[in-house]
């Protein structure tokens, strides 16, 4: 079978899956309830807020030293900052921070994506929230930590790599800062690692729905040299969701050819 025939076969399977409506819930059958809580880890430090999936640590500094603020070169200077840092995950944390700034009087002042994933193909993350009141900043970090149980729902991995999908009906300031996403419009993030998987996912997404490209990153251009391809899209909510789900199906199919079936550790939310 030629490579073109293989791609066409996979695309046909993806379109068939997306076009098939999900089974209706059986009346009377209890549905699982997803808990969204920070991990139960304790620490006596006042700066400690909590931990979460992805080796994520939430911290807050009530009164940042001015010399550190100068060295950090933040766009805006705030007396109090919140720190959301992780070994694994970039998209889930950016999406969680986006929800945090929607819910609190805080602002994302810095987003960095270190080469990490604990030796895998992707990123870690370092996100700084700023605010004039330490209680607002702490609340922002709490919201972000709790959101991670949801935003990790469409991260699928196996021994060869991972795929990641994110979706929101209304982008806010974290997505704008990270990718230039239009505020108030639906936004989707599509990630594939190895990068070859991500390129195919990106192409599938754009062919499956009428969406706009916001940003594209590849190993030498915008990914901290991780082995990923990343597409960020915007548009009408239904179209963005369609593009993201189409990319998810073809990404899972292709990644499975390199190893076991890709699995997610949290329930899918898209």
UniProtKB/Swiss-Prot annotation:
Bacterial microcompartments (BMC) 100-200 nm in cross section are formed during aerobic growth on minimal 1,2-PD-B12 or anaerobic growth on 1,2-PD-tetrathionate medium, but not during aerobic growth on glucose, anerobic growth on glucose or pyruvate-tetrathionate. BMCs can constitute up to 10% of total cell protein. Artificial BMCs can be made in E.coli by expressing pduA-pduB/B'-pduT-pduU-pduN-pduJ-pduK (in this order). Enzymes can be targeted to the BMC, and appear to be encapsulated within it. One of its GO terms (biological process) is propanediol catabolic process. Disruption phenotype: Releases increased amounts of acetaldehyde when grown on propanediol. Cells do not make BMCs, diol dehydratase is found in diffuse aggregates near the cell pole; it was later found this a double pduA-pduBB' deletion. A deletion that prevents synthesis of both proteins makes no BMCs, about 20% of cells form amorphous polar bodies. Grows in an interrupted manner on 1,2-PD and vitamin B12; grows for a while then stops, then restarts as if a toxic compound was accumulating and then decreases. Keywords: Bacterial microcompartment. Transmembrane segments: none annotated. Belongs to the EutL/PduB family. Changing residue 7 to T: Makes about 80% BMCs, 78% diol dehydratase content. Residues 47-152, 154-258 form the BMC circularly permuted domain. SMART domains: BMC (SM00877). InterPro entries: BMC_CP (IPR044870), BMC_dom (IPR000249), CcmK-like_sf (IPR037233), EutL_PduB (IPR009193), PduB (IPR030984). Residues 6-18 are annotated as: Probable helix that binds cargo to the BMC shell. Pathway: Polyol metabolism; 1,2-propanediol degradation. The gene is pduB. Induction: BMC production is induced by growth on 1,2-PD vitamin B12 medium. The two proteins produced are among the major shell proteins of the bacterial microcompartment (BMC) dedicated to 1,2-propanediol (1,2-PD) degradation. Required for structural integrity of BMCs and to mitigate propionaldehyde toxicity. The N-terminal 13 residues are important for correct assembly of the BMC shell. The isolated BMC shell component protein ratio for J:A:B':B:K:T:U is approximately 15:10:7:6:1:1:2. The N-terminus of the long form (PduB) is required for correct formation of BMCs, deletions in the first 37 residues have substantially reduced levels of the major lumen enzymes. The 1,2-PD-specific bacterial microcompartment (BMC) concentrates low levels of 1,2-PD catabolic enzymes, concentrates volatile reaction intermediates thus enhancing pathway flux and keeps the level of toxic, mutagenic propionaldehyde low. Homotrimerizes to form a pseudohexamer with a central pore. The trimers pack into an array. A probable alpha helix (residues 6-18) probably binds to cargo enzymes, attaching them to the shell. This is Bacterial microcompartment shell protein PduB.
């Amino acid at each position: 079978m030629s490579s073109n025939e293989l791609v066409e076969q996979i695309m046909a399977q993806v379109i068939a899956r997306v076009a098939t409506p999900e089974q209706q819930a059986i009346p009377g059958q209890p549905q699982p309830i997803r808990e969204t809580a920070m991990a139960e880890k304790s620490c006596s430090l006042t700066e400690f807020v909590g931990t979460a999936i992805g080796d994520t640590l939430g911290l807050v500094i009530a009164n940042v030293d001015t010399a550190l603020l100068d060295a950090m070169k933040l766009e805006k200077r705030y007396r109090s900052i919140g720190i959301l840092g992780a070994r694994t995950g970039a998209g889930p944390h950016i999406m969680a921070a986006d929800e945090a700034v929607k819910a609190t009087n805080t602002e994302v002042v810095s987003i960095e994506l270190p080469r990490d994933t604990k030796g895998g193909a992707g990123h870690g993350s370092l996100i700084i929230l700023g605010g004039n009141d330490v209680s607002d900043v702490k609340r922002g970090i709490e919201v972000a930590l709790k959101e991670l149980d949801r935003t990790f729902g469409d991260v699928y991995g196996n021994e060869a790599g991972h795929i990641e999908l994110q979706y929101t009906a209304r982008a806010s300031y974290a997505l704008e800062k990270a990718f230039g996403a239009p505020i108030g419009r639906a936004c989707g993030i599509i990630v594939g690692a190895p990068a070859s998987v991500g390129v195919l996912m990106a192409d599938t997404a754009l062919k499956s729905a009428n969406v706009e490209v916001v940003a594209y990153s590849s190993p030498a251009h915008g990914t901290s040299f991780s082995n990923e391809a990343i597409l960020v899209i915007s548009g009408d909510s239904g179209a963005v969701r369609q593009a993201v789900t189409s990319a998810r199906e073809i990404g899972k199919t292709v990644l499975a050819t390199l190893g076991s079936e890709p699995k997610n550790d949290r329930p899918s939310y898209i």
